[in-house]
């Protein structure tokens, strides 16, 4: 399970180093293989360990190619999907189209989301946090069916 936000740097070759605490689980459970694709609702990237991505692919396979919305979803997620492997230094290469999609420059945030990571431009991440906090403050959580019984 991946949790927490880590500030990392994008090097001049377009690589990022995965934080050390995640490398061993990624190597042992997923052979160091990760699939990177776009988030369809935010300007960030999604990084799935290979076995998690295979579950996503099974769901995508069930979508219709004749339904415009379903086909569009498949086209975006699969069209941008790029499999990478951790190198000996725990780095992965982010292809240019993916870096452009998420406006990634030097400072990046890698954010654990349990079964995957989100990869954000640092400033976009800070803005997103503000938006999330505003959403939580403005909505009555008890009126949200899935959150009504959620407690910390």
UniProtKB/Swiss-Prot annotation:
Residues 5-52, 81-124 form the SpoVT-AbrB domain. PROSITE patterns: SPOVT_ABRB. One of its GO terms (biological process) is negative regulation of DNA-templated transcription initiation. One of its GO terms (molecular function) is transcription cis-regulatory region binding. Keywords: Cytoplasm, DNA-binding, Repeat, Transcription, Transcription regulation. It holds the Pfam family MraZ. GO terms for cellular component: cytoplasm; nucleoid. It is found in: Cytoplasm, Nucleoid. InterPro entries: MraZ, MraZ_C, MraZ_dom, MraZ_N, MraZ_sf, SpoVT-AbrB_dom, SpoVT-AbrB_sf. Signal peptide: none annotated. Its main location: cytoplasm. HAMAP family: MraZ. Belongs to the MraZ family. PANTHER family: TRANSCRIPTIONAL REGULATOR MRAZ. This is Transcriptional regulator MraZ. It comes from Shewanella baltica (strain OS185).
